[in-house]
Amino acid sequence: MNVQIGIDLMGGDHSPLVIWEVLIDVLNSRASNSHISFIAFASREVKEQILSSYTHKEYPEIIASESFVAMDDSPLAAIRKKSSSMALGLDYLKEDKIDAFISTGNTAALITLSRAKIPVFPTVRRPALLVRVPTMRGCAVILDVGANVSVNPEEMLGFARMGLAYRQCLGKAECPTIGLLNIGSEERKGTEAHRQTYRILKETFQDAFLGNIESGDVFGGSVDIVVADGFTGNIFLKTAEGVFDFLRHILGDKLESDVTRHLDYTIYPGSMVCGLSKLVIKCHGKACGKSLFNGISGSIDLARARVCERILSSLS
C-alpha cells in the first residue's frame, strides 16, 4: 500500500531543521520501502535554507507557505492564517493528496483547523486526542488528553466509543474494558459531570465498564480504555511523561534497558485526533530525536492500517 505522509516543519519548540533531520532519518530507515513518501510544509525561508544546506538527493517535496501558526496564536488567529504551513497541510489531507498529517505545533489551533477542514464522524460530537500509554499488561488507550478542556457526559460517552473502536480495529483486546479517570474509585466521586458520565457509561457498556479509575492505577493495566476530559487527561499525560524523565535523570544507566523500553513514552506514536474522517497526528511540541522519529513511524503504521476508516466502520 502506497502511503504519503505530510508533516508541518513549523510551529514546534524546536527549529524546523531539527524536524527535517528526523524526517530524513525516517526516510533513510525505510529506504528499501518505495511505497512510503513524505511532503513537508514550511515557510519559504525555511524551504530555501533546507535546499541550500542539505545535499540529500531524494528530498521529500517541500510546500512553501506564506506564514505559520505560532505556539501563542489563538485558534482565531490560526484560522486567519489561511496560507500557513498547518493550513496547507490540512488542505492537502482534505484533498486526499496525503494520507496523514503530522504537526508538533499549537494544539488548539490544530484541533480548530482540523475540525474546520476535515469532516467529523457523523456519530461524534467532538474529536478527542487519543494516546497509548504503557501498562503492566501492555498498553492502554486514553482520551481525551487535551483537545477539549470542558466536555459534557454525552461527549465523554463518545470518547469511550471511539476508544473502544480504536482498540477493536487494531485487534488489541477481544473484550476491551473501560474506566473513567477520576479522583477516587467510588461511584459518587468527582464532579456532577463525572457522576453523570459514570451512570451513562455503566448503562451503555454494562460489564465492560469497570467504574472510576485513579491516575495511579492506569499503569496497572486494569482497563484497556481510559476516558477523561481534556483538562484532566492532559495533566495526567504530562505528569506521567515528567515522572519518566525524572527517573531517567536520577537513575541514568541504573535503569535496565528493558525497563526503559517498557516505560519510555517516546516509543509510542503521537496523539491521534480521533473522530476525524482523516488521520491527523499531534506530536509533542518539544518532540525531537527518538520521540519524533517514533511519532512519524507510528503515523505510517496507522495510515497503513486505515485506522480512521475502520473506526468509522466500527462506530457505524
Swiss-Prot record:
User: What GO CC annotations are associated with the protein?
Assistant: cytoplasm
- Write out the catalysed reaction: a fatty acyl-[ACP] + phosphate = an acyl phosphate + holo-[ACP]
Q: In which pathway does it act?
A: Lipid metabolism; phospholipid metabolism
Checking SUPFAM superfamilies in the record gives: Isocitrate/Isopropylmalate dehydrogenase-like
Q: Any idea where this protein resides? A: Cytoplasm
The disulfides recorded in the entry are none
Keywords of the record: Cytoplasm, Lipid biosynthesis, Lipid metabolism, Phospholipid biosynthesis, Phospholipid metabolism, Transferase
Give me any GO biological process, just one: fatty acid biosynthetic process
Which EC class is this protein assigned? transferase
- Name where it mostly resides: cytoplasm
Q: Which GO terms describe its molecular function?
A: phosphate:acyl-[acyl carrier protein] acyltransferase activity
Q: Which InterPro entries match?
A: FA_synthesis, Phospholipid_synth_PlsX-like
- Lineage, top-rank taxon, reads Bacteria
Record's Gene3D superfamilies?
Isopropylmalate Dehydrogenase
The record's EC number reads 2.3.1.274
Where along the sequence do coiled-coil regions lie? none
Function description: Catalyzes the reversible formation of acyl-phosphate (acyl-PO(4)) from acyl-[acyl-carrier-protein] (acyl-ACP). This enzyme utilizes acyl-ACP as fatty acyl donor, but not acyl-CoA.
- Provide the assembly information: Homodimer. Probably interacts with PlsY.
Family as reported in the entry's similarity comment? Belongs to the PlsX family.
What name is this protein filed under? Phosphate acyltransferase
Q: Which organism is it from?
A: Chlamydia caviae (strain ATCC VR-813 / DSM 19441 / 03DC25 / GPIC)
Gene name?
A: plsX
